[in-house]
Regions:
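N-terminal subdomain of nucleotide-sugar transferases
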Residues: 1-60, 233-236
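Conserved donor-binding/catalytic core segment of Leloir-type glycosyltransferases
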Residues: 4, 205-222, 229
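Membrane-proximal helix-turn-helix segments that form the acceptor-binding/catalytic region
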Residues: 24, 118, 148-167
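An aromatic- and histidine-rich active-site surface loop
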Residues: 44, 87-95, 110-128
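Nucleotide-sugar donor phosphate/pyrophosphate-binding loop at the beta->alpha transition
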Residues: 139-158, 196, 221-222
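A short, active-site helix/loop in glycosyltransferases that binds the activated sugar's phosphate group
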Residues: 160-187
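Nucleotide-activated donor-binding/catalytic signature segment of Leloir-type glycosyltransferases, i.e.
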Residues: 245, 251-273
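Catalytic binding pocket for nucleotide-activated donors in carbohydrate/polymer assembly enzymes
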Residues: 279-370
């Protein structure tokens, strides 16, 4: 079977959806041909990677994908986005590129991601192929860039065109209870493909410090660190707290951070560097989202390490709890708890008593089997072969 992956966010950095797909490619390519179609704004073609996780990449390059940046006034660019004009240009470019690519590579099946949206829309309009949508972001996330009416109208058409949709249990429930007509039989419910062989930690002598790590993207709205920062203000000199990821280097500019702990802020790093930082930390920090059914995939990356971590959740039905309540070395702290002092005491006691502990690997692989790349890839291949 010839499989085409239509994914964005491969250049200049790899986005979350592309990172998730990267876990599956080795399993998809074990017995099948896999190629990638992706797009980027105006750039030097010589700098574009020729392959992604071993799969050859066909690039769609055009500066029109950055239409809104041509305007002096940001408000005009935002208005263009809200009515889908930027998406429309990207769709046109991708559709033309896919049609031309098909003459060179006669693909039988197409797997696309929902973000960026033109990837899924392009796949939905390719005739005579099996179509599978990899839907790991809830529809509400798209609403941040476009109007609700445009999102619902476009999303309904894209979902209807798919043969199967791979998604999380939370998004599946949200879709089935929404006004978008979709059958349960079309859905393949899995976790994030993050339970894989973990990176071993760097060997070092124990100096008595407790190293905490937040790794990920800091948002001021949907993933605000404010509650954790309130606890951070109560930590002493034993702790080293590292924030690593997008926007983390601006932490002290955006928030009032006061602590006796050693504080380190690091901008977004290559994925392998982030994984090594997780392996070398003592306790990790997970901050849940305020958007319903939107779960940080980092939650399962933390679980995969086998190390202790603290999960801050903003909603009683936060999807992180589905996984963290089963994890023996996780402290779940609700951000609705007004008693910061008591929460800080629980936090400190958890860190001190669990430093150096790990969860049995066999337990993780058994309890989170639906989050392994091999399991998910097999589900996808079964669906594409029907």
């Amino acid at each position: 079977m010839n499989i085409l992956l239509i994914i964005g966010s491969l250049h200049p950095g790899i986005g979350n959806n592309a990172n998730l797909i990267s876990k599956l490619i080795p399993f998809l390519a074990a017995e099948h041909s896999v190629r990638v179609l992706s797009f980027t704004g105006k750039t030097d073609r010589a700098k574009l990677p020729e392959a992604f996780c071993g799969a050859p990449v066909r690039w769609c390059v055009d500066d029109r994908t950055d239409l809104k940046r041509r305007f002096t006034y940001p408000a005009i660019g935002k208005l263009i986005d809200r009515h889908g004009a930027s998406d429309a240009l990207q769709r046109r470019l991708l559709r033309d590129e896919a049609a031309g690519f098909r003459r060179e590579y006669p693909f039988d099946a197409v797997i696309s991601t929902i973000q960026p949206f033109p990837c899924a829309d392009t796949a939905a309009h390719l005739p005579g192929v099996r179509r599978l949508l990899y839907l790991m972001d809830p529809p509400a996330v798209i609403c941040g860039r476009v109007s609700t009416s445009y999102r619902d109208r476009s999303l309904g058409k894209v979902l209807a065109a798919q043969d199967r949709i791979v998604t999380t249990p939370f998004i599946a429930d949200a879709l089935l209870s929404s006004e978008i007509p979709i059958s349960r039989e079309k859905l393949i419910v899995v976790g994030f493909p993050m339970v894989d062989k973990p990176i071993p930690p760097t060997r070092r002598q124990d100096d008595g410090r407790i190293r905490l790590l937040f790794c990920g993207w800091l948002y001021s709205d949907i993933r605000s660190p404010k509650y954790f920062l309130d606890i951070l203000s109560r930590l002493d000199e034993r702790f080293t707290v590292t924030f690593m990821g997008r926007e983390c280097e601006k932490l002290t500019e955006r928030f009032d951070v006061r602590t006796k702990a050693e504080l380190i802020t690091i901008p977004q790093q290559p994925y392998e560097t982030a994984l090594q930082a997780m392996a070398d930390s003592d306790i990790m920090i997970n901050i849940g989202n305020s958007v319903p059914v939107h779960m940080p995939s980092k939650t399962l990356e933390y679980i995969n390490t086998g190390k202790p971590f603290v999960n801050f959740y903003k909603m009683d039905d936060c999807p992180t709890l589905y996984y963290t309540k089963r994890y023996p070395l996780c402290l779940n702290l609700s951000e609705k708890d007004p008693d910061i002092g008591a929460a800080a005491e629980r936090f400190i006691e958890f860190c001190v008593s669990n430093k150096g502990k790990t969860v049995d690997r066999a337990y993780i692989e058994r309890e989170y089997a639906d989050c392994t790349p091999g399991y998910i890839a097999n589900k996808i291949l079964e669906a594409l072969s029907m």
